[in-house]
């Protein structure tokens, strides 16, 4: 899924050296810890100690273990204590976003302040009365707003990944792999600690290798303080604008509004936003089939175990379920030249989306399949953070060749051979 980038140097809102008061108070309020997970206790202990460093630390704060004098040395002691606390509670915090954010934040901060992993640790000082004139505590972002939490912790915007499935189905994975699949039945597009998405496919016609998505099931898993578990299910000719329980949000919890469902075009386009995990999903219906598109935070997409490794968005279609180029080039209900002309109108670049469109229109005989490929490309244009990856050109997914194209290429090869032997 790609390597996690290092956070840039963190600064306070006023540009002063990183005292971390703002960041640590953020961690204190990361409220979706599991009932057994003790990450909130670790956060509180760390906050308690680092608050004493806001003014640069006391004169007798130990040096060593970090650069920048006493305050930095004290900070390293606090970070080592924080890291030790997270290790002790790691077993019960699997899949908890507050825990994983804390672990990665500790690692980044120890690198920034040149803290050694071995060395003295600190115990949080006793809390004293509030100092007069200290002013209100810094504002903290909504614990159910993933992007705001991440930005405050890491000093940068989070990374996002994009996956889509449409048409035959064709799958664009998080790794920008593009496959045409023959999968039938129910297959998981996503299966991680926060989200489960399953697509059910059936043949476009009796005896055909090509299949289309007829049903999509999405489960937003329970997250304490943010949402109740919610299930969304769409089928061909039944694209509801609500979850299965009739609701349009995450429930009555404080962060219930961080999950919402909206419809741009009733019966054909539904958008689900899950701000608490930095995720947006679009489900569409075109030409008697469903399509799926997602933009998801990297940390969320990575939060799965070895037992959850079969995910089309992660690994693409299994090799045994991928249609070869020769299979994609077989004559369908519409001539390839005609399909190419129809697809070219909305997809001028002959990339993987264009190739998929030609295949779908040719096999199904339905020109409306052009809309599915065009919509998938439009979603990618919005969801991708790097538009250099918008157009994909898979090695084994070249556009179906028309007889005229084949003839031109053959003549070109013959001309080169003739020229070489002269």
UniProtKB/Swiss-Prot annotation:
Main location (coarse class): membrane
Keyword Cell cycle annotated: no
Membrane topology: Lipid-anchor; GPI-anchor
Site feature: Cleavage: 168-169
Signal peptide as annotated in the record: 1-35
Cystine residue pairs: 144-226, 163-313
UniProt keywords, alphabetically: Autocatalytic cleavage, Cell membrane, Disulfide bond, Glycoprotein, GPI-anchor, Lipoprotein, Membrane, Phosphoprotein, Signal
Record note on modification: Autocatalytically cleaved at low pH; the two chains remain linked via two disulfide bonds. Also proteolytically processed by TMPRSS6, several fragments being released in the extracellular space; regulates HJV activity in BMP signaling and thefore iron homeostasis.
Family statement drawn from the similarity comment of this UniProt entry: Belongs to the repulsive guidance molecule (RGM) family.
Function: Acts as a bone morphogenetic protein (BMP) coreceptor. Through enhancement of BMP signaling regulates hepcidin (HAMP) expression and regulates iron homeostasis.
Descriptive protein name: Hemojuvelin
Organism for this UniProt entry: Rattus norvegicus (Rat)
């Amino acid at each position: 899924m790609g390597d996690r980038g290092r956070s840039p140097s963190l600064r306070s809102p006023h540009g002063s050296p990183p005292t971390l008061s703002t960041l640590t108070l953020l961690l204190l309020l990361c409220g979706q810890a599991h009932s057994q997970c003790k990450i909130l206790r670790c956060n509180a202990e760390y906050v308690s100690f680092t608050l004493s460093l806001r003014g640069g630390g006391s004169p007798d704060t130990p040096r060593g273990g970090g650069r920048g004098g006493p305050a930095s040395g004290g900070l390293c002691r606090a970070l080592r204590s924080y890291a030790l606390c997270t290790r002790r509670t790691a077993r019960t915090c699997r899949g908890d976003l507050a825990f994983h954010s804390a672990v990665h934040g500790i690692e980044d901060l120890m690198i920034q302040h040149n803290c050694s992993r071995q060395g003295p640790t600190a115990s949080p000082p006793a809390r004293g009365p509030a100092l007069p004139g200290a002013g209100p505590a810094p504002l903290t972002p909504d614990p159910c707003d993933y992007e705001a939490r991440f930005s405050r912790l890491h000093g940068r915007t989070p990374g996002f990944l994009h996956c889509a499935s449409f048409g035959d189905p064709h799958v664009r994975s998080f790794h920008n792999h593009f496959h045409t699949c023959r999968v039938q039945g129910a297959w998981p597009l996503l299966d991680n600690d926060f989200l489960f998405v399953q697509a059910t496919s059936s043949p476009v016609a009796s005896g055909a290798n090509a299949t289309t998505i007829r049903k999509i099931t999405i489960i937003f898993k329970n997250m304490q303080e943010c949402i109740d578990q919610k299930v969304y299910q769409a089928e061909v000719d039944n694209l509801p604008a609500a979850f299965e329980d009739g609701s349009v949000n995450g429930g009555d919890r404080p962060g219930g509004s961080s999950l919402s469902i909206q419809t741009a075009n009733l019966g054909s386009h539904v958008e689900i936003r899950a701000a608490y995990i930095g995720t947006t999903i679009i489900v569409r219906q075109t030409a008697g089939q469903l399509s799926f598109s997602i933009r998801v935070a990297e940390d969320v997409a990575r939060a799965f175990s070895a037992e959850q490794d079969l995910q089309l968005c992660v690994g693409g279609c299994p090799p045994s379920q991928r249609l070869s180029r020769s299979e994609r080039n077989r004559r369908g209900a519409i001539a390839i030249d005609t399909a190419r002309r129809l697809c070219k109108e909305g997809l001028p670049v002959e990339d993987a989306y264009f190739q998929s469109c030609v295949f779908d229109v040719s096999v199904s005989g339905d020109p409306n399949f052009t809309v599915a490929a065009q919509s998938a490309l439009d979603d990618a244009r919005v969801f991708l953070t790097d538009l250099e990856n918008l157009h994909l050109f898979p090695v084994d997914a070249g556009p179906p060749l028309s007889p005229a194209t084949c003839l031109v290429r053959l003549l070109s090869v013959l001309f080169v051979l003739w020229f070489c032997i002269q």
